[in-house]
Amino acid sequence: MAADDDNGDGTSLFDVFSASPLKNNDEGSLDIYAGLDSAVSDSASKSCVPSRNCLDLYEEILTEEGTAKEATYNDLQVEYGKCQLQMKELMKKFKEIQTQNFSLINENQSLKKNISALIKTARVEINRKDEEISNLHQRLSEFPHFRNNHKTARTFDTVKTKDLKSRSPHLDDCSKTDHRAKSDVSKDVHHSTSLPNLEKEGKPHSDKRSTSHLPTSVEKHCTNGVWSRSHYQVGEGSSNEDSRRGRKDIRHSQFNRGTERVRKDLSTGCGDGEPRILEASQRLQGHPEKYGKGEPKTESKSSKFKSNSDSDYKGERINSSWEKETPGERSHSRVDSQSDKKLERQSERSQNINRKEVKSQDKEERKVDQKPKSVVKDQDHWRRSERASLPHSKNEITFSHNSSKYHLEERRGWEDCKRDKSVNSHSFQDGRCPSSLSNSRTHKNIDSKEVDAMHQWENTPLKAERHRTEDKRKREQESKEENRHIRNEKRVPTEHLQKTNKETKKTTTDLKKQNEPKTDKGEVLDNGVSEGADNKELAMKAESGPNETKNKDLKLSFMKKLNLTLSPAKKQPVSQDNQHKITDIPKSSGVCDSESSMQVKTVAYVPSISEHILGEAAVSEHTMGETKSTLLEPKVALLAVTEPRIGISETNKEDENSLLVRSVDNTMHCEEPICGTETSFPSPMEIQQTESLFPSTGMKQTINNGRAAAPVVMDVLQTDVSQNFGLELDTKRNDNSDYCGISEGMEMKVALSTTVSETTESILQPSIEEADILPIMLSEDNNPKFEPSVIVTPLVESKSCHLEPCLPKETLDSSLQQTELMDHRMATGETNSVYHDDDNSVLSIDLNHLRPIPEAISPLNSPVRPVAKVLRNESPPQVPVYNNSHKDVFLPNSAHSTSKSQSDLNKENQKPIYKSDKCTEADTCKNSPLDELEEGEIRSDSETSKPQESFEKNSKRRVSADVRKSKTIPRRGKSTVCLDKDSRKTHVRIHQTNNKWNKRPDKSSRSSKTEKKDKVMSTSSLEKIVPIIAVPSSEQEIMHMLRMIRKHVRKNYMKFKAKFSLIQFHRIIESAILSFTSLIKHLNLHKISKSVTTLQKNLCDIIESKLKQVKKNGIVDRLFEQQLPDMKKKLWKFVDDQLDYLFAKLKKILVCDSKSFGRDSDEGKLEKTSKQNAQYSNSQKRSVDNSNRELLKEKLSKSEDPVHYKSLVGCKKSEENYQDQNNSSINTVKHDIKKNFNICFDNIKNSQSEERSLEVHCPSTPKSEKNEGSSIEDAQTSQHATLKPERSFEILTEQQASSLTFNLVSDAQMGEIFKSLLQGSDLLDSSVNCTEKSEWELKTPEKQLLETLKCESIPACTTEELVSGVASPCPKMISDDNWSLLSSEKGPSLSSGLSLPVHPDVLDESCMFEVSTNLPLSKDNVCSVEKSKPCVSSILLEDLAVSLTVPSPLKSDGHLSFLKPDMSSSSTPEEVISAHFSEDALLEEEDASEQDIHLALESDNSSSKSSCSSSWTSRSVAPGFQYHPNLPMHAVIMEKSNDHFIVKIRRATPSTSSGLKQSMMPDELLTSLPRHGKEADEGPEKEYISCQNTVFKSVEELENSNKNVDGSKSTHEEQSSMIQTQVPDIYEFLKDASDKMGHSDEVADECFKLHQVWETKVPESIEELPSMEEISHSVGEHLPNTYVDLTKDPVTETKNLGEFIEVTVLHIDQLGCSGGNLNQSAQILDNSLQADTVGAFIDLTQDASSEAKSEGNHPALAVEDLGCGVIQVDEDNCKEEKAQVANRPLKCIVEETYIDLTTESPSSCEVKKDELKSEPGSNCDNSELPGTLHNSHKKRRNISDLNHPHKKQRKETDLTNKEKTKKPTQDSCENTEAHQKKASKKKAPPVTKDPSSLKATPGIKDSSAALATSTSLSAKNVIKKKGEIIILWTRNDDREILLECQKRGPSFKTFAYLAAKLDKNPNQVSERFQQLMKLFEKSKCR
């Protein structure tokens, strides 16, 4: 019927219906016939109208048909209606999906915009480089004509020879001659580079080269122009320089594409200047660019230079494409091209050598001109062919080329910078340029030559095979001819080479001199170090590179960001080519490519050069290139070189650093290609390369296979080079620590350390006997550097697997050594695991190459992503942490030394740190390959060097036990080992290094253990879940196994579908109970406890009872009843929290038990463990436990040292466990930061000693001993974080550490990370521990337990531990975990650099509440702690501006999930949390408006710059509040997008609040918070007012800084926590202050006045404010400003509360504040405060309230702060909330205050004042307040938003609106409550709202407090997507929403009305309301 209807029966149907139905109707009432007529007529269409009789029947039929049709039609209509409804529903869904799609599209587009910006940048770079290349090609194409015009070339040669003659006699004339040559060249070569030439001419080569090396330029000129040797070298050196300069210039060109030509001209000019005499020929060789355009010689040189630079660029490009080729292809093509190139280079070298002789120079110049012409032609053809053949990959190539060039340039630039410091000793890879300038240029040229040649040869198969046939044939013919000449020349040069060898020896000194004098000495250096000089020049090039490179770095860093997948391969191409050449043609590769003609001589020469600087870098390349022939020599030379290097180390340090960086970078870049290359020279590089290449390990393997012949040489070189690199690394580390800023230093260190550590480690590995020594050196020196090596470690891990297969061909030992070295690097690198993990994953972002990266740490840069993968291995994160701790000892070795050091440590568990470092270095290095083979577990390779094997065996067993814990975290294990600076820590290392062993030995030991009880799983089944350590020696091992089971349980749970039954859940929990209890029962705990059965029973009972509670639980039942879509996630979150709590409880029991047990004989047990191999793992555990107990005992006896050790041990254990879980990433972050600190501080040992002094405040201790601090942090973290880190913080933390992460992180992770960031924990450190903070901030009773336990549950341990500042494991577990985790994160990173006792308050805002008992002690220590802390904290304090690009789960609301109140509140007091949240809000609001983030494309230079160690160190020394890291540091959310946050962690202000102030903070803050807060606000701006007013001053300072930045958030949080902790003291202090004032009321009044005064002083700027009411309002608003102005007085005032009050009174008088209003508000506040004051705070609150009353609005805040005990940092907000606190629960108010303060202290202050005034009945102030608020807000915003007028305006508007709303809010408590909710939810924007609402409605206090808390949690005021403000919510908006919803109810009409009013989408409004309500509810829950 439907078909009929549709088909047109529709009409007939309707006809029927119109006719037949009518008849049906008629039939009933009419005659059939009567109807029949009509029926016949109507239905005539259907019925033929037969006979009438028939018609009757027909009519019936018709009616039946009609009715049937009607029925079917009706049915169809019903169906149609249903379908319509369905359509409507679907359309609704569609629209919803469309809206979602739209939002997603918007997000995507914002992402695309960012990415496109990056891509555009990359394309611009690519285009620029293409243009450069095309220009070079044009020149080259021009050069062929010039080549043909040999007359012209010869003419130029004659000119050049004339120049040479004139210049050779005069070094000084070199520059002149260079200029002449330049002018000549510019005339001849003017081409398009006339401007660049002019520039070059204008800038003599010295100038140009003087970028990094002025002397070098002169030296090079002199060297090249004057000396035959220099000429000789200059041939190469010039080309190298040219290529290097070309690259430098490329960097320049990156900035200035015109500079490209300038660069070319620079290189040409430089080449001209250097070898002016030689340059005719050399330029033809090395600087074709320079001469190519003007004259034949220029032509040939410029053509060659073009070919060099072109091949450099193109070579790089080709290199990238070549890298893309299979290694075999590369090796073959490389071999072919290299063989050709060898000839060429040999001829060139011989020519260069001959050129050294002016006579031979001219000839050779012509020859070289001819040859370079042919070469250039070949290269041109080759490049053209390459371009032609690789056009598709051209962008890629260009990109990789850019990146490689960028990396090279980066390296070179960085090296150049170092070279500026010490240019001489760097003969980088090519080491051909005699003078450093020529080196840099020659390096470029040689690099380009070699790379080009390599590319030509490598790409020759691609393009070269096409054009190569022609070009190569020509080139080969020419090269053969040249080679003949060269050979003839070589015969002469052989002498030269011998001379060169001798001279190279001289060159070491000469090079130094040359680099330093860079003039006359270049002569000898040139001859002797033609290659060495080239290397130097390369290094110089690298050095000069940084100038351009850093410029280029931005783009390249962006490129790298874009290149995230480009991976070092593309960055590596140039160096890779060199190294590949080295590998494939050991002689021709590396330096040999350029020196191939000199190969034979180079063999002899290389050794000598190797001995010299070449030995450092050139040897690496020379030996690499000539590894086979000169392998032994270079090895000896390298060994010799290491010594000279040490001599040269100062200069070499930088030079070598640059060289190393370059070579390492090259290796890193070449890591894929060098894989094989590593076989010969690059073994160190190989490690690096393999690491960076790790993803391309297959390639590496192929390369290795292709270069199987080279392995021996590579091993030798590996050892030598590694050693050299190690030395270089040592120097470089020093340089890094000194030279690099924190971010820059960190990144550079990461890059350098990684590469260096790799090289050093590979060196160490090959020369294992030396490895112990070198590793120690490296470990000590490298450790600071080896932060970066963290990255390497993960790479090594994966690499080791591949390397083993490939490297074993060479030498299993060497490969193992390499791997171990890599492991070392990994261990060290793991510190920077973030970075090098990125290298691993984001190989394209070679931090080594990204030397300038410090500028940009952004999601774009996210090197971390790849790291995340490695991090997943879990080893890198922990290693870095521990590496930090053991930076000196283990960093390089940590991964490798883990097993070794573990064995050593196990043997001497407490004292083998150094020994184990050495041993573990070598041992770990050996073990690392196998260990790293398995990502989850570090297999300590018995294959590792045999000397280490014994250790490893011992450590294996130990590790077997430990590994089970750290098994999943081999890197962590290593880091643990590193952590085990104390012998105890070593066991962790060992156990993790021996993860694989653990699996095996552990299995045996496990199997030895049989089931003990009936209700237990079989050991075999258990072992399937977890490697059982039958006789665990430490609580950590037990916890590790438990965590493994927990992971297994989670794994099983996650196998469930989204919906599953309660029975299934019960089964999972039951299986978990069985697994846990079975494990406990299987374990032999005799090493941990005396009463094993009792302990087991207790543990099993706790597990069963807790898990049964989890099984049968109302929450679980409700979750199953609700069957929410995310039930599974929520349920597991609940289970996870419970398990966290359970684990913490178990750990407490184990720790306490092991403490008592461990006191017996830690040393003896440790010794036993070291003695007993079988018992090693157990012994180690025991020794760890013993050391823990011992530490605890010591701690008890000497609270400091014992605490330190205990906490270290406990931390180590917990770290170990936590590492095993996911702490590794957190630790890595911490350690990265710590390493930075350490690098800056290099106070590990000092910090250790200091650490003991700090041990009482062990969490603080982290600063003193990064290792121990890290251990403590880790322990704390691991205890709680071990539980929670499992969740997923590991990745995030590590990502945070790396600052760049695109790794997917869970919302919880993101939230944790960000929460920690926003909460002000040391953002990087706390990124680790902050997450951990959240992690250990157990949402479960643990928080309370922690608080109670720290004092009561674990009186002995906890009290001591609390006293020790969470030093002991127990307190760590309990209270320490809560605050000490944060503190350890914060404190350790801060204090790690400083070895001073860190006050818990100082250490950790989160742990502040825990420190209350320790406050008295802490107070005393606070000053010292703060003093010691400043350096460490300075990193963050100092505008560390670490741009953390945290992948944010926030999609629109993500911040809600990401700022989970439960997470942050779990461990920290609500007040602290509110402080965090308020800081968060401030961050968010100010961030959105003030801190307009400039996308990370340009990474935050300020952050990297300000994070320079020197900068933040000096800053940390800032007077007064050295504890600033927490207070002043704030994470400024530079960019908030759905994907990520770019958080800049910067110091809020150099707030000077000192420890005294902090200690005073609780009471003083509470009572005098208004005063001190304002003072503090003023203080920071005017001066750091005395530290005595620490908290409030610092709070205000923070507020100022918050206003300026969002740093005050952390400050607020910290201060809040501190306030809580310090409340008694502060209370007393406040009482004292109040007494000083006469009485608390007077004090309060005076404080109020003071606040007013402060405000008034702010009004001083805002004198327009007529009345004191206005002033008081404005004071609150202006507090930021006020405290600025008042700071003069406040400094005094902060010193003396009485003085402060007096000053305040004076200010009040000056302001002429309306005393009545102030008094009224004060009274009101006083009443409310007194009534609402909380607990002990009540007294303080009363005092504070009176003070606050005297302050006016602030008194309420003061009361609130007092009541909260967390006087939250923002004075204004605190005051606001204090006033509100009087009316409402202080905590709520405090939270609100935080939010308000965070958002806008001025606004909140204004609001508060408004509310206060309105409360007192001064409503007139409300009307005035808006203006005042605007003024103060303006001021505050002006302070913070000077650069953000829009934000100011918006905030002003918000303030006005808020003020307007405030009156209504005051009118209705509900409204105020809504405002409070709004404010709290808005965190930043609603600040004003919250205070007003709070004040207006005491009842709302809770909600407002909750809102405040939730504000920090979620409601984003500014929703940005990729930097674009999509939605902007102001406090006024929130207030309107809340008020309207209160009045009208949350209906759609209300939302529509609000949407119209607010100009928003109703959906947005409703969403915002929901967010605010969520926040409000969350805050309520809190």
Swiss-Prot record:
Modified residues (N6-acetyllysine): K1343
The entry's keywords: Acetylation, Activator, Apoptosis, Cell cycle, Cytoplasm, Mitochondrion, Nucleus, Phosphoprotein, Repressor, Transcription, Transcription regulation
Modified residues (N-acetylalanine): A2
Motif interval(s): SUMO interaction motif 1 (SIM): 1683-1687
Modification Phosphoserine occurs at: S20, S194, S567, S658, S815, S875, S940, S1161
Subcellular location field: Cytoplasm; Nucleus; Nucleus, PML body; Mitochondrion
Motif (SUMO interaction motif 3 (SIM)): 1794-1798
GO molecular function, one term: transcription corepressor activity
Region of interest called NCOA2-binding, as start-end residue ranges on this chain: 1709-1982
Upregulating conditions: By TNF which induces strong nuclear localization.
Pfam family of the protein (one): Myb_DNA-binding_7
Stretches with biased composition (Polar residues): 225-240, 396-405, 894-904, 1171-1181, 1269-1281
Superkingdom of this protein's organism: Eukaryota
Annotated Gene Ontology cellular component terms: cytoplasm; mitochondrion; nucleoplasm; nucleus; PML body
Positions of the UniProt region annotated as Disordered: 159-552, 569-593, 875-1017, 1157-1188, 1251-1283, 1803-1909
Intervals of motif SUMO interaction motif 2 (SIM): 1737-1741
UniProt feature, compositional bias: Basic and acidic residues: 159-191, 198-210, 286-395, 406-423, 444-455, 463-524, 905-924, 936-965, 999-1016, 1157-1170, 1851-1865
Gene Ontology annotations of biological process type: apoptotic signaling pathway; cellular response to mechanical stimulus; extrinsic apoptotic signaling pathway via death domain receptors; Fas signaling pathway; signal transduction
Gene3D superfamilies: Homeodomain-like
Assembly mode: Self-associates. Component of the death-inducing signaling complex (DISC) with CASP8, FADD and FAS. Interacts with NCOA2 and NCOA3. Interacts with SRRT. Interacts with TRAF2. Interacts with NPAT. Interacts (via SIM domains) with SUMO1 and SUMO2. Interacts with SP100; may negatively regulate CASP8AP2 export from the nucleus to the cytoplasm.
PANTHER family linked: CASP8-ASSOCIATED PROTEIN 2, CASPASE 8 ASSOCIATED PROTEIN 2
Role played: Participates in TNF-alpha-induced blockade of glucocorticoid receptor (GR) transactivation at the nuclear receptor coactivator level, upstream and independently of NF-kappa-B. Suppresses both NCOA2- and NCOA3-induced enhancement of GR transactivation. Involved in TNF-alpha-induced activation of NF-kappa-B via a TRAF2-dependent pathway. Acts as a downstream mediator for CASP8-induced activation of NF-kappa-B. Required for the activation of CASP8 in FAS-mediated apoptosis. Required for histone gene transcription and progression through S phase.
Full protein name: CASP8-associated protein 2
The organism of origin for this protein: Homo sapiens
Organism phylogeny: Eukaryota, Metazoa, Chordata, Craniata, Vertebrata
